[in-house]
């Protein structure tokens, strides 16, 4: 944990790094601990006042490793938020992660999702979807969303 950070974002971002692009943009402006579930061996979230969960969308939901981390490692009552990227927008993309945090009685402070470059399955044959995303506007909107989380936490 960083010496002053009160917020952590637990994430998984693999194929094109779409989600990580958003998180790195945020971390250039604000002190936030980014925890990559694909590299962390033990995750202790007990020292954070707010925890974010971030992922690309895989088969309509957050990556299983992020959902499992929320179930196993999230302290009860800690406010949470979600950030995600998707190839195509569908309903209920945050349902699995929301269900995981609800077991810990955690208030959900909001979510931000945007398009991300996607070459999964048949999309690869046509060169992928959303080639230029996340773009500058997506990054800016992610930062504005994060600023609402900070204001919520401070207020």
Regions found by a protein language model. Give the residues of each.
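Short N-terminal binding/cap micro-motifs at the start of the first secondary-structure element
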Residues: 16-21
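A conserved segment at the C-terminal end of the G1
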Residues: 23-27
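Short amphipathic alpha-helix with an adjacent loop that forms part of the alpha/beta core around
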Residues: 41-47
């Amino acid at each position: 944990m960083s010496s002053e950070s009160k917020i952590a974002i637990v994430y998984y971002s693999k194929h094109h790094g779409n989600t990580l692009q958003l998180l790195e943009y945020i971390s250039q402006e604000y002190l936030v601990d980014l925890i990559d579930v694909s590299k962390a061996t033990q995750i202790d979230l007990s020292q954070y006042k707010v925890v974010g969960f971030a992922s690309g969308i895989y088969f309509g939901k957050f990556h299983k490793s992020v959902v499992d981390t929320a179930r196993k490692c999230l302290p009860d009552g800690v406010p949470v938020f979600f950030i995600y990227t998707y190839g195509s927008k569908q309903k209920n993309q945050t349902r699995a992660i929301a269900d995981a945090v609800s077991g810990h009685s955690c208030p959900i402070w909001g979510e931000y999702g945007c398009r991300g470059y996607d070459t999964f399955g048949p999309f690869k044959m046509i060169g992928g979807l959303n080639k230029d995303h996340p773009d500058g506007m997506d990054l800016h909107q992610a930062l504005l969303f994060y600023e609402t989380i900070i204001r919520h936490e401070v207020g």
